[in-house]
C-alpha cells in the first residue's frame, strides 16, 4: 500500500521525522518497503495565468503566449502543449529556475521568437513519469505563489506491506490509528457533515442472500455534472497513492476508499430496469454484459448486484460493465455494503478479478462505517459536481453482521508467554489506545475488540498486540534460565549455520521462500506425489504445501533471469511437507537443505576467453564440499537414478552407506522448456536430519616417509561408473599403504571402441613405518589390475 505522509499527518501528526515514522511502522509489523519524496527539490517555478495565446507564425501546433506571473511584466513563452490556451492558470518556470533533473531555465529563441521560461508539465517537475499537456491549476490558484509550496510537494510517499489479517490498515485512517496508538496520541474524529435529502427518490433493495450481504445502504444522487474537474487536492492525494484520475465520481469514490477503507459501488440510475436493486445468486447460464460489449458467463451461485432483469455487477468487485457511469451520466446510485470476506475472496479468485474492491472486501471492511462512507462520498460529490441527494435506503440484518466477542486475558498467561512483566496500567492503556473496550479486576482483563479488528478472536491475539505496541525493542534482554546440564560428549551435531556459511563462502546466496508453492510447478517436478492442498490459499500461485525446496528455488531463478541475471548460485533450508498416512497428522515434516546453480561457471572477465556454462560436476563439487564437513565423505556414494524432475543422464541419488539422503542433477530439458528457463539449471537437495551428525575425526600420525603414485588405465563399458572402479581398488590394500585413489582422466574417441571409455586412476602410496619398496607397490598395482579386468570385463591400455 502507498500513501502520502502529509495525508497521514492530517489525521495524526506525531513530533517525529519521516525516517522515525517509517521505523515505527516497521517495528509495529508494517514493513516499509520504500520512503521517497514526491519529487526532487526545484525552485523558480510559480503560478501564472496565460493572458494571451497565439499560433507561432513559423511552426505548426506551437503557441506564443503571454503569461502573468505576478510581476509587472508579462512573460513571453513559447509552448507546444495541446492544452495550451488563454485564461488558464499554469506552473511557470522562469529564467533562472532549476528543475528536478538539474536543468536551469535560460532565455531561448525558437524560430525567431524569444521564450522567457517554460510552461511546466507534471513530468518536467518530476512528479509523474509521463503526462500529456501542461499543468492546469484551479482558476482561484494565487498568481505568483511558489508552485512547490502551493502543491505541498514537501511530502513523502511511504509504501508498506500490509499482512492479510490487517484489512483494517488498508486505509489512511487505519494506518493513522496505529501511529496514534504507538505515539500515545489521540486520533482526530471523523467529521462528516450530515446529508439532508433534497429529493424523495428512493430505490427498493432486495437482499436474497442475507448471510453473505447482511448490510446494504443505497442513495440516489441526481443532476450531477460528471464532466466537472476533480479538485486538485483530491487528484494529488490519489496520484501520490498510485491511483490515476478518471473522472470526478470515480476519483471521489477512490479517495474515500483510501481514506476510510470502505468501497462504494456506483451505477448509472438510468440504466437500471424496474427501479429495484437485488443482491442474489446468479442464475444458470446468466450473462453479464461488460463495458466493451463482451459478455462474461457467470458461474452458478455467484453473488451479484442486479436489477429486476439483469446482473449489474459481481458483488465486491469493480466489474467494468455496460451499466457503469459514463460521460453522459447525470443520475447515479451510490451503494455501500458489507459482504462476507471469504465469499468475495473465493469469487475474485474464480473470476481472476483482483482489484481494489475485492482486495478490501476479501480482508474485511468495517460494517460500522458503511453509512459514514456513503455520506462522505455524497458530501464530496455535492461539493465538487453538484447534485441533489435522496434519502438513504437501509437494509441491515444485525443478526447476520459479524459481532466482536468478549475475550478474557489472564495476567499469568501474558507474563508466561512474553517472558517479562508490563504494568497493569500500561497494558490497559495500550488496549484502550488500540480502541478496545477494557475492564480489569483480579488480574484479569475483560476485553471487547473494536468493529474494525476482525483478526482479534483469542487471548493470544491480544498478547501479540500488547507486545507489538509496547515495542519489540523494549523487551528486556534476559538470559534463558535452565536446569539442563550440557553433556560435552555430544559434540557431534553440526549447526545448520556451519553448512550455510560454507555455501556462502562458495559463492551461494541464501533465499527464503514461502512453504506454499505453485501447484503446476510442483506437479512438473514431482508428478507421482500428491501434495497437501490448501483450502483457502493466499493466491492461486501458492495453493499447495511444498514437497521439496526446488519449487521455490526454480521460481527465484526464473524471476532473476527475467532481470538479466546470468549467473545464479542460491540455496535454501526449510521444512518440506510429505503426506504419509502413518505419520503424525498424516504428514512428515522434513528439514531439507537444497541448492541451485544456473548460467555461467564464472563471472565475465577479460582474461576468460571461453564462456563455460555450469555443469553437473560443478554442483557435485559443492555437494561434496558440504558433505565433507560431516567427515563421512568416504561413505557417500552417488548412484545413477532416474528422477522425474532431472535429466536421466545427468542425475544421481546420494547415499550415505545404504540410506538415500538426497538427489542431485540437471533439470530435465522438457521441464526447462516448459518453465522458460533460458540456460541449464542444476539442483541438489539433502535431508538435514540425515547429514547433521558428523564423525569426530581421528588423530593420525603424519608419515615422514616419501609418497609415491602409479597410474592404471583401463578400458571399460560406458555403463561402469568411476566410483565403482575406485571402490574395488580400495578393497585390495589397507590404508597403511594405499592412502588415496583419484580419477585423473576419462577418454573416449580414437582407438577406443564404441560403447567403451578409458579410465585412468591414480593410486597414492605411503607407509607410516618405512619407505615402500618397488615390489610392494607393484604387487598392489598388479592386484588392482587383475581384479578390475575380472570385475568390469576391462582391458588395460
Curated annotation (Swiss-Prot):
Binding-site list for Mg(2+): 455, 465
Main location per the UniProt record: cytoplasm
Residue stretches making up the tRNA-binding domain: 39-148
Keyword Nucleotidyltransferase listed: no
EC number assigned by the record: 6.1.1.20
Domain named FDX-ACB: residues: 703-797
GO molecular function, one term: ATP binding
InterPro entries attached to this UniProt entry: aa-tRNA-synth_II/BPL/LPL (IPR045864), B3/B4_tRNA-bd (IPR005146), DNA-bd_dom_put_sf (IPR009061), Fdx_antiC-bd (IPR005121), Fdx_antiC-bd_sf (IPR036690), NA-bd_OB-fold (IPR012340), Phe-tRNA-ligase_IIc_bsu (IPR045060), Phe-tRNA-ligase_IIc_bsu_bact (IPR004532)
Keywords noted in UniProt: Aminoacyl-tRNA synthetase, ATP-binding, Cytoplasm, Ligase, Magnesium, Metal-binding, Nucleotide-binding, Protein biosynthesis, RNA-binding, tRNA-binding
Catalytic activity: tRNA(Phe) + L-phenylalanine + ATP = L-phenylalanyl-tRNA(Phe) + AMP + diphosphate + H(+)
Main EC class the enzyme belongs to: ligase
Recorded GO CC terms: phenylalanine-tRNA ligase complex
Gene3D superfamilies documented for this protein: 3.30.56.10, Bira Bifunctional Protein, Domain 2 (3.30.930.10), Ferrodoxin-fold anticodon-binding domain (3.30.70.380), Nucleic acid-binding proteins (2.40.50.140), Phenylalanyl-trna Synthetase, Chain B, domain 3 (3.50.40.10)
Name of one Pfam family that matches: FDX-ACB
Note on how the cofactor is bound: Binds 2 magnesium ions per tetramer.
Cofactor(s) annotated in UniProt: Mg(2+)
Domain B5 per the UniProt entry, residue ranges: 402-477
Assembly and interaction partners: Tetramer of two alpha and two beta subunits.
Family annotation (PANTHER family): PHENYLALANINE--TRNA LIGASE BETA SUBUNIT (PTHR10947:SF0), PHENYLALANYL-TRNA SYNTHETASE BETA CHAIN AND LEUCINE-RICH REPEAT-CONTAINING PROTEIN 47 (PTHR10947)
HAMAP family: Phe_tRNA_synth_beta1
The protein, known as: Phenylalanine--tRNA ligase beta subunit
